[in-house]
């Protein structure tokens, strides 16, 4: 028969769920539910999230929470999962509280109308009694209800569940028993498989050596740990035999049996005591954990219950310093009034009034704060009105709702708050007469009407010396006087100013910004540079190769020799342009030349553009590419370089003269360079002669030091060799001397022994006297 899981939660199931959650966490609900035979993973998760979670608040609902709940229910209807984390309760708690508020409001309205007002059974049912389960009904949400108390006698299923949970939850270290058994079975199967394989190979004549030892470790199955092999050869065992005989004689079987029994009893007592201590320790530990958890829960509940609304108090109307100033001013006024009353002048006594009759004779009480609107009741009325309204398809007027200040509003997630403040008794219309409707009393001691005046500091006197209406009266009198002035004559005057002068003045008054001026100057400079680049020759614009040195005289002479005037002018202008480019834009590494003959006329830009246009038009009638190729081949086959055709017609004498002049110029440059070199050499000798001598002296010293160092190294190596040989010789000499000393000592001992023996023999011999013994 299948078991239907669910139902009311018991205290045992709650405790098992807490322990399993502490071990498995909040994500392994299948494992958690495996410890509870009557609950599913979904029910376990719901029980934890709805009741057992320590973060769940189970205290009474406050007014702020009710307002927030109704406000969020108005913004997000039926979205209890979204509302719950904002309110700080669970979704089920929010839903139950919402329904309870609606039921209570409905009961109040029913009781106010025709409800039951009796006592006991005659009274109307409460909201809790309406939702209470009747006999035979099943709770649809048992996870949100308190646990049922445990019975005295548990069922067999409960006992089995409790024992299994205790056994599984107690194993907090190591692997599980099933996993260990499975690993042992796998290891045994591997061992048997390897054994069967070795047997089959051995039957086939193949011996396989079993090597289970890892590198650097010992195989305790094959080797003997801490083995000490006896020394090879024969040795005497009489001592061991004697020791064995003594131990055999001293051995008493009864004593050994008694000692073994005592040792076993001691071990059993120790094991019994250890098990008892472990049991007591586990019980005490579990008890301590339970007590600690209870204390923590009480502390959390106390913290939650202690979170009350902040006490809102108004700011003080008068500070300590102002009170002291008021007291001092009152004392000064009393002294002045007393002096005036004691004066003999009647006018003085009449002018000084009495300021003691202030409206502060009665004790000031803090008035009661005005009654606030009940937001909860208004929101419940709105919700019930919306629920009871008819469909919008039927038409009609909208349902009247309590909006504005009387509701929580739609401003945000948090409901609208009504700021509570204590009324100011000094700013309230009181008994004394006031000039205006709803104004502050104008008698002494009242708050003044004009802004900037301090209450209780400048009270009004009885003679209207400081009347507030004086300023208003003077202003009205001034306006009347201005209105009485005669009207000006109707004369029209037309004034015209020159527009140019106004524009110039405006331009002068307006100062140009520095950045705008720099930008304008930069644009003008860039435009001038671009125009200057366009005025250059095509060779400079296209950066074409050009001669480094230009002989202007030779080019001008060649241009003058051309018979055609137009061609001569073109050649002359080309020569002038080449020379001008060489002077203004010299090639890299070439010193710019200076010539007074080069004077290029500045051509207008319009004329230059017209000339370029004519060149382009004439270039359209250029020769064919075949003719150009033929001319190029002819010039290429000529041995004379391009550009030197002008020198082909010169006479031989002129060429010789030119070459001689070039040779003389080269010789002069060589001579001048040699003279400059000699001068520089003398100057360097003069400046660096001392350094050269110093360097030569240092070079000699370095050579001498190097030679001395090499000699010292040779001497050092020789002495090292001598030291080594001396050490060897000293050792040999010491050995020889020791041998000689040993030989002398041995000979001396032998002589002493001989002397002693002879002396003893002489002492034992009879004394001979005159030849008789």
Curated annotation (Swiss-Prot):
PROSITE patterns: HTH_MYB (PS51294). Its main location: cytoplasm. Residues 114-191, 219-321, 338-372 are annotated as: Disordered. Residues 129-151, 240-255 have a biased composition (Basic and acidic residues). It holds the Pfam family Myb_DNA-bind_6. It is found in: Cytoplasm; Nucleus. One of its GO terms (cellular component) is Prp19 complex. It comes from the Eukaryota. GO terms for biological process: mRNA cis splicing, via spliceosome. One of its GO terms (molecular function) is DNA binding. Keywords: Coiled coil, Cytoplasm, DNA-binding, mRNA processing, mRNA splicing, Nucleus, Repeat, Spliceosome. Residues 156-203, 648-754 form a coiled coil. Involved in pre-mRNA splicing and cell cycle control. Associated with the spliceosome. This is Pre-mRNA-splicing factor CEF1. The lineage of its organism: Eukaryota, Fungi, Dikarya, Ascomycota, Pezizomycotina.
């Amino acid at each position: 028969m299948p078991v239907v899981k669910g139902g009311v939660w018991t205290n045992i199931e709650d405790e098992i769920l807490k322990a399993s959650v502490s071990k498995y966490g909040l994500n392994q609900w299948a494992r958690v539910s495996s410890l509870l035979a009557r609950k599913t993973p979904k029910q376990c998760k719901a029980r934890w999230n709805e009741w057992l979670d320590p973060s769940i608040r189970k205290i009474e609902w406050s007014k702020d929470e009710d307002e927030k709940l109704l406000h969020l229910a108005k913004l997000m209807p039926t979205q209890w999962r979204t509302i719950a984390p904002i309110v700080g309760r669970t979704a089920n708690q929010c839903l139950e509280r919402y329904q309870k508020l609606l039921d209570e409001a409905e009961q109040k309205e029913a009781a106010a109308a025709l409800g039951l007002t009796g006592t006991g059974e005659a009274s109307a049912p409460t909201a809790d009694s309406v939702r209470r389960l009747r006999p035979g009904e099943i709770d649809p949400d048992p996870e949100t209800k308190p646990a049922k108390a445990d019975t005295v006698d548990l069922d067999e299923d409960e006992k089995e569940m409790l024992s299994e949970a205790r056994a599984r939850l107690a194993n907090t270290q190591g692997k599980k028993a099933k996993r260990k058994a499975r690993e042992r079975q796998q290891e045994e199967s591997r061992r048997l498989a390897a054994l069967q394989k070795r047997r089959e190979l051995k039957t086939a004549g193949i011996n396989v050596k079993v090597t289970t030892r890892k590198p650097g470790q010992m195989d305790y199955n094959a080797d003997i740990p801490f083995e000490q092999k006896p020394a090879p050869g024969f040795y005497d065992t009489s001592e061991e035999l004697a020791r064995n005989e003594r131990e055999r004689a001293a051995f008493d079987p009864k004593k050994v049996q008694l000692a073994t029994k005592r040792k076993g009893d001691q071990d059993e007592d120790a094991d019994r005591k250890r098990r008892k201590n472990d049991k007591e320790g586990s019980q005490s530990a579990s008890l301590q954990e339970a007590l600690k958890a209870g204390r923590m829960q009480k502390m959390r509940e106390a913290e939650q219950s202690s979170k009350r609304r902040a006490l809102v108090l108004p700011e003080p109307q008068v500070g300590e310093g102002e009170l002291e100033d008021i007291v001092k001013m009152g004392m000064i006024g009393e002294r002045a009034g007393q002096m005036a009353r004691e004066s003999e002048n009647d006018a003085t006594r009449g002018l000084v009034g009495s300021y003691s009759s202030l409206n502060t004779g009665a004790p000031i009480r803090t008035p009661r704060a005005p009654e606030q609107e009940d937001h909860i009741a208004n929101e419940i009325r709105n919700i019930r009105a919306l629920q009871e309204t008819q469909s919008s398809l039927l038409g009609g007027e909208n349902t009247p709702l309590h909006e504005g200040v009387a509701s929580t509003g739609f401003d945000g997630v948090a409901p609208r708050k009504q700021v509570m403040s204590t009324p100011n008794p000094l700013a309230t219309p009181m008994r004394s007469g006031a000039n205006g409707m709803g104004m502050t009393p104008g008698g002494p001691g009242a708050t003044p009407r004009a802004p900037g005046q301090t209450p209780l500091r400048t009270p009004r006197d009885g003679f209207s010396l400081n009347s507030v209406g004086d300023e208003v009266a003077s202003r009205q009198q001034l306006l009347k006087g201005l209105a009485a002035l005669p009207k000006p004559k109707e004369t029209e005057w037309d004034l015209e100013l020159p527009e140019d002068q106004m524009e110039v003045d405006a331009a002068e008054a307006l100062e140009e910004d520095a950045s705008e001026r720099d930008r304008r100057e930069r644009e003008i400079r860039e435009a001038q540079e671009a125009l200057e680049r366009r005025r250059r020759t095509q060779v400079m614009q296209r950066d074409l190769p050009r001669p480094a040195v230009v002989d202007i005289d030779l080019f001008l002479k060649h241009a003058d020799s051309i018979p055609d005037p137009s061609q001569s002018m073109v050649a002359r202008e080309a020569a002038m342009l080449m020379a001008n480019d060489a002077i203004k834009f010299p090639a890299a590494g070439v010193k710019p030349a200076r010539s007074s003959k080069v004077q290029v006329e500045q051509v207008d830009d319009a004329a230059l553009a017209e000339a370029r246009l004519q060149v382009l038009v004439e270039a359209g009638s250029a020769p064919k590419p075949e003719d150009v190729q033929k001319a190029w081949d002819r010039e290429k086959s000529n041995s004379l370089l391009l550009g030197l055709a002008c020198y082909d017609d010169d006479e031989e004498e002129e060429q010789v003269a030119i070459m001689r002049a070039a040779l003389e110029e080269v010789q002069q440059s060589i001579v001048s360079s040699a003279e400059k070199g000699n001068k520089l050499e003398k100057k360097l000798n003069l400046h660096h002669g001392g350094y050269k001598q110093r360097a030569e002296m240092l070079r000699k010293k370095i050579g001498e030091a190097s030679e001395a160092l090499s000699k010292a190294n040779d001497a050092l190596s020789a002495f090292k060799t001598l030291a080594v040989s001396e050490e060897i010789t000293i050792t040999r000499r010491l050995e020889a001397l020791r041998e000689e000393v040993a030989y002398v000592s041995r000979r001396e001992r032998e002589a002493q022994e001989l002397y002693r023996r002879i002396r003893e023999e002489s002492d034992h011999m009879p004394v001979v006297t005159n030849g008789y013994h």
